[in-house]
Amino acid sequence: DLRMSRGLGDVYKRQILSHDHFQGGHYEFAMAKAPIEKKWVFPGFEDVDAGIVHWPMSCIRLICADDERLVELADQILTAWRGYTDESCFVYAETDGEPHNTITPIARMRDGKFQLDLVLRNNLTTPEHPLGVYHPHAKLHHIKKENIGLIEVMGLAVLPSRLKQELFDLADLLVARAPTAGYPEALQKHAEWAQDILDRHPELNADNVHLILQDEVGHVFAEVLADAGVYKMDTAGRAGFVRFLESVK
């Protein structure tokens, strides 16, 4: 069912395609360290090293000493992606006249060459996923419900401030092995997750609970990035990614 949901979902749909800003800084994010898992040669751009980055969000990396060639190829990829549909991967360029595809670009200089990471984005929504098919899904909203921006795309979790106190309170309940049914209302959204943590960490105690929670939040954030990735890191997803690359002319 490709009927677009309304309300809050519309806010997120508009944001991903119209939220324009430039952000700079001197910090090496995890995505910048991720290797290329599959090299690719774009016809007519044999001088540009390219490939699929080993990252949960769908990222194409371009490397070239000539920045103009890099921009020329990036523009070609963006144009192709804006008009690209692959129903087998649930990728639609538009529905009901509304466009869905865009790119988040990240540029850096490394070893005397320009690098440009192009992260494929799609803001399609459905009744099942009213905030976005490629957005954190409902089971993760107790940790992260907000939109996935540039910083998160590169691997640094920007989490809601409410979590700071909630995780401290949750730590006390975990150490006490308190029944999840008795959790206060503000922590009920974490109950299922908390029980799963206890089941997998019988060693949890007052000394290690905060480290365990930090690690578990990290695992949730990895799932957030996986949800936001258009092409999943499995055989079908990577095959779909290659089909798109083949379409870039």
Q: Positions of the model-derived regions?
A:
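Single conserved hydrophobic/aromatic residue that forms the stacking wall/gate
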Residues: 1-8, 12
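Beta-rich nucleic-acid/ligand-interaction surfaces
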Residues: 10-18, 95-102
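Extended, composition-driven regions rather than compact fold-specific motifs
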Residues: 3, 109-111
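Active-site/ligand-binding surface loops and adjacent short beta/alpha elements
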Residues: 74-106
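Histidine-centered divalent-metal-coordination microenvironment in nucleic-acid enzymes
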Residues: 13-29, 119
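A conserved active-site cap/scaffold subdomain adjacent to cofactor or substrate pockets
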Residues: 51-87
